[in-house]
Amino acid sequence: PAIARMMESHGIEAYVSIQRGDSWADGIYNILSEEWANNGGVELERIRYAAEVQEFSSYLQQAENVLSAAVDEYGIEHIAIDVIGFQEVATMLQQAQDYPTVYEVVWFGSDGTALTSQIRDDAPDQASHVNLYSTLAAPAESQKYTDLYDRYWSLVGMPYGYYTACTYDIGWILAETILESQSTDALTLLDLQYTTAFNSFGASGWNRLNEDGDRYAANYQIWAYRLKPDGTGEDYIAGLYDFVTGQVTWYTQEIGYTPPTR
């Protein structure tokens, strides 16, 4: 629900979905579409493109037609694009500037467009222009995470994100269950992992698992793109979705404005 709440909190009433044609994007779209409809939002169009596509003009024209027709009804500040993709979105953004309404509305995304080097490096002007607010699961703030972040950054020059922290925690949980059971049998370890994870506060936060064996929901940071004084792009955190309260906090000093309301 994080993407839906993010768009609602930015005053969006109607949006166009542009997504990769694969199971990953379909999964995100299906959750978003249901959450969006449940809160009275309008989905103007669903546009699905093949994962290998590098020419987006026909899809962008389709979005332009739909969005330009919606401006009079909703207002430009209340319509948006939600894009579900990966590094190909950099190419899409470069081409989007030829479509005035598409390029004027705010864009939103998911973890596939957060902290994406191709977008930051190849389309910094365009990403900054449309903001491309993208959700990314957030690690708990702790000294453990901060220490690892600093060490990781010094070694590889990249942020130490939530998924990297989860991978680190998985390694520790696996090691602890192997030592406890004195076994590497998968079924033996599986029985121990719920308790071990429940009692573990790792780099990513509390490692508690749900009944399906998946990590419990986390908060989501909202990442965006902006230009540095030298004209290159950079990532920054624009807000936070709190999964406990279901509320979004926008960091207005960072984004430079107060988002409109519905």
Residue ranges of predicted features:
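Extracellular/periplasmic Venus flytrap/periplasmic-binding protein
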Residues: P1-D98, A140-Q143
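Buried hydrophobic packing segments
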Residues: I3, M7, I170-I178
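Extracellular/periplasmic catalytic domains that process cell-envelope and extracellular macromolecules
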Residues: S9-G11, D72-I76, Y99-V102, P124-S128, ...
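Cofactor-binding loop segments of dinucleotide-utilizing enzymes, especially the Rossmann-like FAD-
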Residues: R20, S110-G112, L227
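Extracytoplasmic ligand-binding site segments that recognize negatively charged/polar headgroups
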Residues: R20-I31, S117-Q118, A165-G171
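Extracellular/periplasmic periplasmic-binding protein-like sensory domains
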Residues: L93-Y168, Q182, T249-P260
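Segments of small-molecule ligand-sensing domains
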Residues: Y152-T164, A175-I237
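Conserved C-terminal helix/tail region of periplasmic/extracytoplasmic solute-binding proteins
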Residues: Q193-A197, K228-R262
